[in-house]
Amino acid sequence: MNKLAILAIIAMVLFSANAFRFQSRLRSNVEAKTGDACEQAAIQCVESACESLCTEGEDRTGCYMYIYSNCPPYV
């Protein structure tokens, strides 16, 4: 292979690696901004949303625990 072909292959590999890293970072930023509805309800201290948005069991219990430990008038 000539030098130009080798350089082109190296450039393609580096470009695809950077594109993959950018896509992963973008995906994690979007997930961090949206979060799940149960978590958002807890952060916003909406007890009724814990009942309507969270599934039975651990999710709902965690939502209530967050509210009771961090949100007025419980604090």
Swiss-Prot record:
Residues 20-35 form a propeptide. One of its GO terms (molecular function) is pheromone activity. Disulfide bonds join C38-C54, C45-C71, C50-C63. Residues 1-19 form the signal peptide. InterPro entries: Pheromone_Er1_protoz (IPR016058), Pheromone_protoz (IPR009064), Pheromone_protoz_sf (IPR036245). Keywords: Cell membrane, Disulfide bond, Membrane, Pheromone, Secreted, Signal. One of its GO terms (cellular component) is plasma membrane. Mating ciliate pheromones (or gamones) are diffusible extracellular communication signals that distinguish different intraspecific classes of cells commonly referred to as 'mating types'. They prepare the latter for conjugation by changing their cell surface properties. The membrane-bound form promotes inter-cellular communication and adhesion for mating pair formation and may act as binding site for the secreted form. Homodimer. This is Mating pheromone Er-1/Er-3. The gene is MAT1.
